[in-house]
């Protein structure tokens, strides 16, 4: 499935350029979700986050423009309810999944994440202090029974599991060439 995003989301602004703007010249906060979502306060905005390609050039991630202390509710999340596992979905319960190709679908995986998703309240929480410019990470096994696609983990944390799976599926690692 191909997901197209508006050009304003694909841009990869550097944190330095965002912080160097004088306050009076900064544009009003814009939601990272399309206008058709008509969301109120508490949802992710361009004032607090940006979506950009990872430093290694692989994949997109959500990065912060400001600090979030441990225990802070970072934001509310939104999306469409679907009944199949696909890229950018997060499992709510059973066969119900939240499809969010604008924000939560771009949270990066870490075996030692800095956020926690409360899928009952649709809230994202900081479980560690998060600095400006840092990628938001979650443990994909914390929400998913079965992943859309398993993959090797490169998070580098001391407790790295090396292979990312859902919490209820066996690892299907490719055979090692001899």
Language-model segment annotations:
Residues 2-178:
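Conserved catalytic SET/PR domain of SAM-dependent protein methyltransferases, capturing the structural core
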């Amino acid at each position: 499935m191909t997901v197209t995003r508006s050009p304003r989301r694909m841009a990869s602004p550097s944190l330095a350029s965002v912080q160097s703007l004088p306050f009076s010249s900064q544009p009003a906060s814009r939601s990272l979700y399309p206008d058709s979502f008509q969301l109120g306060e508490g949802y992710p905005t361009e004032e607090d986050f940006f979506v950009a390609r990872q430093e290694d050039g692989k994949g997109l991630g959500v990065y912060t423009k400001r600090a979030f202390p441990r225990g802070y509710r970072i934001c509310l999340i939104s999306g469409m309810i679907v009944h199949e596992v696909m890229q950018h979905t997060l499992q709510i319960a059973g066969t119900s999944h939240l499809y969010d190709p604008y924000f939560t679908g771009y949270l990066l995986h870490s075996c030692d994440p800095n956020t926690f998703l409360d899928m009952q309240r649709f809230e994202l929480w900081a479980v560690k202090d998060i600095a400006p410019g840092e990628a938001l990470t979650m443990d994909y096994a914390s929400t998913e029974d079965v992943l859309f696609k398993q993959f090797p983990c490169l998070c580098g944390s001391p407790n790295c599991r090396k292979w990312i799976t859902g919490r209820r599926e066996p690892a299907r690692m490719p055979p090692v060439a001899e």
